[in-house]
UniProtKB/Swiss-Prot annotation:
The gene is QSOX2. It comes from Arabidopsis thaliana (Mouse-ear cress). Its EC number is 1.8.3.2. It catalyses: 2 R'C(R)SH + O2 = R'C(R)S-S(R)CR' + H2O2. Residues 1-15 form the signal peptide. Residues 290-392 form the ERV/ALR sulfhydryl oxidase domain. This is Sulfhydryl oxidase 2. It holds the Pfam family Thioredoxin. Catalyzes the oxidation of sulfhydryl groups in peptide and protein thiols to disulfides with the reduction of oxygen to hydrogen peroxide. May contribute to disulfide bond formation in a variety of secreted proteins.
Length: 495
């Protein structure tokens, strides 16, 4: 083939590629693999904005054929790098998103926001975008047009003015206000609701990855822990996911032999994401450390245990205690941590009769762990320099918790400690859910409020008897009804 023919052939290939919408889409997807801005469309627009933990959202309406949009994209991505994804510098504050109005499927969505030019940027609380719209003549709207964001610097300055921050494009990971924020900030705990979901999903994934349910003992331990989550997890989606695992457990793990691989059906544990398909997200917020290998998962697990402890009733206290002890002993993969925790469990000689006793035991155990790790990390230099282990709670958060203290010991007022823990890991922990629910529809507000609802009498039940815990958890009525229906429908298949 001559050089002329080769050039003609290459030209035809290029022409065909440029004229094919499918080819353009493929090329755009390849080039966007590392994009930080979240691509939204008419299908996922509401769900993504409704579920984001971020307090604010930026939505860019653009057209992929628009030269100005292509030139603006690097500027937008510089800002998105600060806020989006697992490597975000300031995660959980602003969600940066994009909608391609050149795609026919997005036409109605773009029309709802009266998009008059490209690119056009909007700002507001994420929930205000959900099933929302924008009209240029409307005087009062919580959705604002960003009128000064033509460069990355100007866009970030505009955002800084809105939220009273001083973020910079040169901010580096873990060298930021978010990581340096004082743990004594009472309002920080509201972000931990997402970290509890993250830690729950990560713990479940670790069990799947290690195929850790290997005996009747580990199977029983797993079931009891999932029962505890189904009744008392602070996240409704985690409670729902745990309930679905319970209902299907006999089929997923016949005789304790579980199938772990993820497939297209619902016949393996891997196909039941315990906190929903969007969790884990890949990053932590309240539990974010100043180094990649600090805090995170272990911090999230502690918040989970504290949040469970304040949600149980007196009759469940010892069941919750033995369930958590067995779970750590069977499924926590840090061997030294597991052994130390098990020793503290074995030191309890008398069964707990009051929920208060269990709340204080979790708190005391956490402080003992922190004391030990503080010494180890100081000698080895492995601690988090920005978040050193401390005795909890500090005086700044609960001065009444301290009767007296010196460098060697602290005399605690256990009644005030208990009241502090009940509030801090109870109503305070779900405050963000309550705040976000204000702007939602009635149905969504009810769902958000359910995150405050816990069981009042969840008891130990045999393996496979998910119905029993549903009946026992009287305050968890919706879940009980769901379980009863599922178990009733399953009976004919067991004949």
């Amino acid at each position: 083939m001559s050089l002329v023919h080769l050039l003609l052939f290459a030209g035809l290939v290029i022409a065909a590629s440029s004229s094919s919408p499918g080819s353009r889409l493929i090329l755009r997807e390849i080039s966007d693999q590392k994009d930080k801005a979240v691509e939204l469309n008419t299908t996922n627009f509401d769900s993504v904005l409704k579920d984001t933990p971020a307090k604010y959202a930026v939505v860019e309406f653009f057209a992929h054929w628009c030269p100005a949009c292509r030139n603006y994209k690097p500027h937008y991505e510089k800002v998105a790098r600060l806020f989006n994804g697992p490597d975000a510098i300031h995660p959980g504050i602003v969600l940066m998103t994009r909608v391609d109005c050149a795609m026919k499927t997005n036409t109605k969505l773009c029309d709802k926001f009266s998009v008059s030019h490209y690119p056009m940027l909007f700002w507001g609380p994420p929930t205000k975008f959900v099933s929302g719209s924008w009209e240029p003549k409307k005087d009062k709207s919580e959705i604002l047009v960003i009128d000064d964001g033509r460069t990355a610097e100007r866009l970030l300055n505009w955002i800084n003015k809105q939220i009273g921050s001083s973020y910079g494009l040169d901010d580096q990971k873990f060298k930021n206000e978010h990581a340096l924020s004082n743990l004594t900030d009472y309002n920080q705990i509201s972000q931990a609701v997402y970290d509890v979901e993250e830690a729950t999903a990560e713990a479940f994934d670790i069990i799947l990855a290690h195929k850790a349910i290997k005996s009747s003992e580990t199977s029983a331990s797993f079931i009891r822990f999932i029962q505890l989550l189904a009744a008392h997890h602070l996240s409704r989606r985690c409670r729902k996911g745990a309930a679905e695992i319970l209902v299907n457990y006999d089929d997923l793990c016949p005789s304790g032999n579980c199938s772990y691989e993820k497939s297209g059906g619902n016949d393996t544990l891997g196909n039941f994401p315990i906190c929903g398909k969007d969790v884990p997200r890949g990053y932590y917020m309240f539990c974010r450390g100043s180094k990649n290998d600090t805090r995170g998962f272990s911090c999230g697990l502690w918040v989970l245990m504290h949040s469970l402890s304040v949600r149980i009733e007196d009759g469940e206290s010892h069941f919750a205690f033995t369930t958590i002890c067995d779970f750590v002993n069977n499924f926590f993969m840090c061997d030294e941590c597991r052994l130390h925790f098990n020793d503290m469990c074995l030191s309890v000689k008398t069964p707990f009769k009051k929920a208060r006793d269990f709340v204080l035991w979790v708190w005391s155990t956490h402080n003992k762990v922190n004391e030990r790790l503080l010494k180890d990390e100081a000698s080895l230099g492995t601690g988090d320099p920005k978040f050193p282990k401390i005795i909890w709670p500090p005086k700044e958060l609960c001065p009444l918790c301290y009767l007296s203290s010196n460098q060697k010991s602290i005399e605690w007022d256990h009644e005030h400690v208990y009241k502090f823990l009940k509030n801090y890991y109870g109503p305070k922990l779900v405050s963000l859910y309550k705040e976000k629910s204000v702007s939602r529809s009635k149905e969504e507000t009810v769902s958000a409020t359910e995150d405050l609802t816990v069981a009042t009498n969840a008891l130990v039940v045999p393996i496979g008897a998910a119905l029993a815990i549903a009946i026992a958890s009287c305050a968890f009525g919706a879940l009980a009804c769901y379980w009863r229906t599922q178990q009733k429908n399953r009976k004919p298949r067991r004949r």
